[in-house]
Design a protein with these regions (language model features):
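Hydrophobic residues in well-ordered beta-strands that form the structural core
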Residues: 52, 92, 117-119, 246
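Contiguous beta-strand/loop segments that form the cofactor/metal-binding neighborhood of enzyme cores
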Residues: 181-254, 281-289
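N-terminal Rossmann-like dinucleotide-binding module
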Residues: 1-46
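C-terminal helix-rich "cap/oligomerization" subdomain common to oxidoreductases
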Residues: 66-69, 282-316
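Rossmann-fold dehydrogenase core element
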Residues: 105-122, 143-145
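Beta-loop-alpha module in the N-terminal Rossmann-like domain of NAD(P)-dependent dehydrogenases
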Residues: 46-109
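Predominantly a Rossmann-like dinucleotide-binding segment in NAD(P)-dependent oxidoreductases
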Residues: 123-195
């Protein structure tokens, strides 16, 4: 049984706690927030036995094996270091950190401490993603030539202040674009060789629209993310003999396979569910088997993504 503690008592942590409850070999036993009242309220609502008004007290709990970090992006680096120094395995929300240097530092420390560390890129673990990857491996669309993905919605800067605050790690790339950036190369098992991008910025300075072109080893990927306009949240993988469509790419349950005549010849749908379950199951499996990183979501993926996002966000 793997016992989890949660740092950050927000909505996404609630989804994580629900996912853990669906597993027989994991349990959330504590939550910490900078506000003791918030932690107490959250723990009562989620039926969590222990709560703390600071992170250090949670990390001092000897029963906790692993920590799920659900704080804002700007806090991730320090939170991860604190957890690893306390001897806890770590699952941290995306984006894991904000630079390649930070990514290298936390990944190296995790290995030095013999601890598991993973970015919570849950889309990689969804059954529809696994299905699409298998179709590609089987050659059902032929050689992949192009991948495209868009993800965007019109965010309210007043209601969604965090998304537009550079001090909190806001911006569309950290919040939305990270999904296709880390999932599309995974589908074809290829490294990103080159990149160019265009960035539009909000008055606060964060990116609110990004368009990227990625040169992979044998194909090209285009992706766009935005807080300024609603976009179809779909991904397409185009091969020489057909294509795959992933509706609602980062959270949906469906994959569709089309031939060159634009006919749907196969499909998969896992149904509506809490998609975090597959990610958490992988974390538990890795910890129980002594793995320091997941083969599905390895450290190098996080390091590469951190390097690219940093390069994009420094464009003017």
């Amino acid at each position: 049984m793997i016992h989890f503690g949660i740092i950050g008592a927000g909505d996404i942590a609630r989804k994580f706690a629900d996912a853990v409850r669906q597993l027989d070999n994991a349990e959330v036993i504590a939550v910490a927030s900078k506000s003791l009242d918030r932690a107490q309220e959250w723990a009562a609502r989620e039926h969590i036995p222990s709560y703390y008004g600071n992170y250090a007290e949670l990390l001092a709990n000897p029963r906790i094996d692993a920590v799920y970090i659900a704080t804002t992006t700007n806090a991730h680096y320090d939170n991860i270091l604190q957890c690893l120094q306390a001897g806890k395995h770590v699952l941290c929300e995306k984006s894991l950190v904000r630079s390649a240097h930070e990514a290298l530092t936390v990944c190296s420390l995790a290995k030095q401490k013999n601890l598991f560390l993973m970015e919570a890129m849950w889309t990689r673990f969804l059954p529809k993603t696994t299905t699409a990857k298998q179709w590609i491996r089987e050659g059902r669309i032929g050689k992949v030539k192009l991948m495209q993905a868009t993800i965007g919605w019109k965010a309210d800067p007043v209601y969604n202040k965090r998304l537009f605050d550079p001090a909190l790690g806001g911006g569309s790339l950290y919040d939305l674009g990270i999904y296709p950036l880390e999932v599309l190369p995974y589908l074809v098992d290829e490294k990103i060789l080159d990149m160019d991008a265009f960035v539009a910025r909000h008055s606060t300075g964060v990116d609110d629209l990004v368009s990227m072109n990625l040169q992979l080893e044998s194909c090209i990927a285009n992706l766009q993310c935005s807080f300024t306009t609603k976009m179809p949240e779909d991904a397409y993988i185009y091969g020489e003999d057909g294509y795959i469509r992933l509706p609602k790419m980062h959270f949906g349950s469906r994959a569709e396979l089309y031939n060159s005549a634009d006919e749907c010849i196969d499909s998969f749908d896992s149904g509506e569910e809490n998609g975090f379950v597959y990610e958490v199951a992988e974390v538990v499996h890795c910890i129980e088997n002594g793995l320091l990183e997941s083969p599905i979501c390895p450290h190098q993926m996080t390091i590469d993504a951190a390097r690219i996002t940093s390069e994009v966000l420094h464009l003017r």
